UniProtKB/Swiss-Prot annotation:
Pfam families: CheD. Transmembrane segments: none annotated. GO terms for molecular function: protein-glutamine glutaminase activity. The gene is cheD. The keyword Hydrolase applies. Keywords: Chemotaxis, Hydrolase. It is an enzyme of class 3 (hydrolase). The lineage of its organism: Bacteria, Pseudomonadati, Pseudomonadota, Betaproteobacteria, Burkholderiales. Belongs to the CheD family. This is Probable chemoreceptor glutamine deamidase CheD. It catalyses: L-glutaminyl-[protein] + H2O = L-glutamyl-[protein] + NH4(+). Probably deamidates glutamine residues to glutamate on methyl-accepting chemotaxis receptors (MCPs), playing an important role in chemotaxis. Residues 207-226 are annotated as: Disordered. Its EC number is 3.5.1.44. It comes from Bordetella bronchiseptica (strain ATCC BAA-588 / NCTC 13252 / RB50). The keyword Hydrolase applies.
Length: 226
């Protein structure tokens, strides 16, 4: 399937904390580098981001999808909000940029049960299981993963060398509510319409702190993991 041009992230900025040019990836977007030294950043709740790169040529990309799969008979399923389409687009764009399929490596993040609406429908868990199954089917090794739990996550990905920095917001973090509830409302509404479930969105209490984790790429002789 050809990638929709309007799904490619275009929000560029300079991140002073990392002293790096950066691209912000919003839900339903993706970005693939062409060897440039740039950081890709996104915020995840129940959504999942796959970070895939070719370590030999330093080309990589990230997507951000909301739901696992849609009705294959519906035109709406061919949109970036569905993992099946978002993964296909990301991999195809990496290959167009010169990556070799047999060298692709992945790191996957998100799928948290952050909002009550998403907990009710197991969206985060379904997204996480989907991306792992998809990559296994495609034969792409998962070098690191941080899926599930109850945390919102900020992902900072450096495609050139495969590094990923994950900042986890504490459960019931007010800032997480503002970011995640706004960006994932569309996903909850979509699933509600499909399942007739009645989602609840609870408010978060005072922030309690954050935890930052780093996911480097192990050497090919190291065991798979974080």
């Amino acid at each position: 399937m050809p990638a929709r041009l309007d799904a490619r992230a275009t929000r560029r900025y300079f991140d002073s904390a990392f002293n790096s040019p950066a691209v912000k990836i919003l839900p339903n977007e993706y970005y693939v580098t062409n060897g440039e030294d740039v950081m890709l950043s996104t915020v995840l709740g129940s959504c999942v981001a796959a970070c895939i790169h070719d370590p030999v040529i330093g080309v990589g990309g990230m997507n951000h999808f909301m739901l696992p799969e849609g009705d294959i008979h519906s035109p709406a399923s061919a949109t970036m909000r569905y993992g099946a389409f978002a993964m296909e687009v990301l991999i195809n764009e990496l290959l167009k940029a010169g990556a070799v399929r047999e060298r692709l490596e992945a790191k996957v993040f998100g799928g948290g049960a952050v909002l009550s609406a998403m907990q009710l429908m197991n969206i985060g868990e379904r997204n996480g299981q989907f991306v792992l199954n998809y990559l296994k089917t495609e034969g792409i090794p998962v070098r690191a993963q941080d899926l599930g739990d109850v945390h919102a996550r900020r992902i900072n990905y450096f495609p050139r060398d495969g590094r990923v920095m994950v900042r986890k917001m504490a459960p019931h973090h007010q800032k997480a509510e503002a970011l995640i509830a706004q960006r994932e409302a569309a996903a909850a509404q979509t699933v509600q319409a499909e399942t007739r479930a009645a989602p609840r969105v609870e408010r978060f209490a005072r922030p309690g702190g954050m935890r930052v984790e780093r996911f480097d790429t192990p050497s090919r002789r190291d065991p798979v993991g974080a």
